[in-house]
Amino acid sequence: MALANAGFTVDAVCPSGHPLMVTGAHRRTYPYHGLRPLASIEAGIAAAKPDLLIPCDDLATRQLHQLHERARSRGAAGSATWALIERSLGARESFPVVYARTPFIEMAQAEGVRVPKTASITNRNDLDGWIARVGLPAVLKSNGSSGGEGVRVVRTAGEAVSAFRSLQAPPQLARGVKRALVDRDKTLILPSILRSRWEVNAQEFVVGREATSLIACWNGTVLASLHFEVIHKVSSSGPATVLRLVENAEMASATQKMVRRLGLSGMHGFDFMLEDSTGNAYLIEINPRTTQVGHLTLGPGRDLPAALYAAVTGQTAQPATKLTEKDIIVLFPGEWTRNPESTFLRSGHHDVPWEEPNLVRAGLEKHRKQSRWYSHRKLDKSVSTASVRHL
């Protein structure tokens, strides 16, 4: 919606039943098939002939990287496709780095960015050695995961061993089936069948508050940025539901350095920890795609869709009217479904897309399906009542 408002004509490749399909923000959608993802994306590109690609989740970015490799192997026949992907995401040299947690952190450290100690863990000996050198607690993270699913905070050696085995293991077929049936997302089916294993990384635990940035950039230059401190989350390792807009010079400097070093274009997220004792900002990872705040238009320098439109068209950026003067942003439907009585729903800016009532219903319906799967009957009932009252 924000991209369309900025001037873009929006087409999308997405699974059947995706919430985007109930909005008026797109011109056309093209089917995404979880068992034939690259063919789906390539067909969408061929039909839409886009000027820019914006991946909206980690899997989409990885598959664009794979499609880029396939296109380059075709020589001249694939040149238009790989050039479009590089134009949209940035230098191809960045592709192997943005999904490799340890090399990314090592690169950030070389750029003078403050980072926690991080190392790749391939076996039990590596894990024991890490604990002996760095100590506990620690954070274990798997490459190839997203949305907090591949993150574990461990406080004992036993927890570390258990988490390592869990994170390294291929996704369970039952989890893939759940994703396919409830979320209409078939992306875990193939990895679970192939028994693909993830690489695990250990990261030093920073005592502090989570923070996050989203950057619009072009050819290694930051065009616009949003920096937030995380106030509430769906769960300890889940997405944020309440954010506070902040100005943080260290976060801004870190993102500028990494965007320049990697030669990035498009939208990219960066996650930080703000250390309690010092306030220092530690860069902990990159999200090489847009995040759930990409649509927020918060004035000059903080309107990412307008900045990207200007970069693509060569025009001067025309930021939209500032969404709110409040610095507390309450994300929908996350906080509403986390706690329907949350005081932030009234005190902050509750970012509900009221202009698209079908999208509001779709967001709440997705929560209801997930609640039924996990038997969260009480929460499901309270949210259902709230949604009927307002819609």
Positions of PLM-derived features:
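ATP-binding N-terminal substructure of ATP-dependent carboxylate-amine bond-forming enzymes
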Residues: 1-91, 125, 129, 374-375, ...
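Peripheral (often C-terminal) accessory segments that flank ATP-dependent C-N-forming ligase machineries
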Residues: 306-391
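A conserved helix-loop-beta module that forms one wall/lid of the active-site cleft
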Residues: 27, 78-150, 172-189
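Conserved metal-phosphate-binding beta-hairpin within the catalytic cores
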Residues: 215, 260-295
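Short beta-strand-to-turn element immediately C-terminal to the catalytic PLP-Schiff-base lysine
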Residues: 121, 151-156, 216-218, 245
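Oxyanion-binding "anion nests"
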Residues: 226, 236-270
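Glycine-rich phosphate/pyrophosphate-binding beta-alpha loops
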Residues: 148, 230-243, 287-301
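Phosphate-binding site of ATP-dependent enzymes
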Residues: 164-233, 246-253, 274, 280-282
